[in-house]
Amino acid sequence: MAGVRVKICGLRTESDVKAAASSGAAYVGLVFFPKSPRHLELAQAQRLALAAPPGVAKVALTVDASDETLDAIVEAVPLDMLQLHGGESPERVAEVRARYGLPVMKAVGVADEGDLPQILEQSLAADQILIDAKPPKGAALPGGNGLSFDWRLISGRHWIRPWMLAGGLTAENLAEAVRRTGASQVDVSSGVESAPGVKDPARIAAFLQTAR
């Protein structure tokens, strides 16, 4: 499983960022979604982004955010990528990409084969795709729910953009997830927490050790 790149999402403290970076994370994810226990205010996010060392990409996760909200985030926080994790259309993805001049990763929720065409549709506009478990109906959060999907749905498939696997990943199931899907990039949030929004440095280290 050599060379799997890891994004640790939903970091809330500078020590979280340092734990992720020192263990070898390629990306750190900062969440801007008030319903989430991982939500950050702008000043807090700015401090975290500045704590990330060179070479670690800083990603802002938003959910159906307005231009006004995105303007404020991009102005305040030094970023390398935007992650759109709501119901944004390919047209909206293209608008955001053009407006800010930043790469955009679009999340696509998967529960069954009928969800797979969205991956190609969003790939026409986004720079990367995050393939995540579709949240249950009525769920408050679009991601970070600790749920997996049937990895066989994407086994052996190829898309036109780089992609990242998410959804219920832990140090214990990571090797199996990568073996089944062929993922070269993975995203984890709840799988390295001791409680919602509370990252565990030991779990971060174990996850990244497994990814090496």
Swiss-Prot record:
Look up the EC number in the record and give it.
5.3.1.24
Any one of the GO BP annotations: L-tryptophan biosynthetic process
This entry's Gene Ontology molecular function terms read: phosphoribosylanthranilate isomerase activity
The pathway is: Amino-acid biosynthesis; L-tryptophan biosynthesis; L-tryptophan from chorismate: step 3/5
> Which reactions does this protein catalyse?
N-(5-phospho-beta-D-ribosyl)anthranilate = 1-(2-carboxyphenylamino)-1-deoxy-D-ribulose 5-phosphate
- Name the HAMAP family for this protein: PRAI
Q: What family is this protein classified in?
A: Belongs to the TrpF family.
Report the protein name in the record: N-(5'-phosphoribosyl)anthranilate isomerase
Recorded source organism is Cereibacter sphaeroides (strain ATCC 17029 / ATH 2.4.9) (Rhodobacter sphaeroides)
Q: Which gene encodes it?
A: trpF
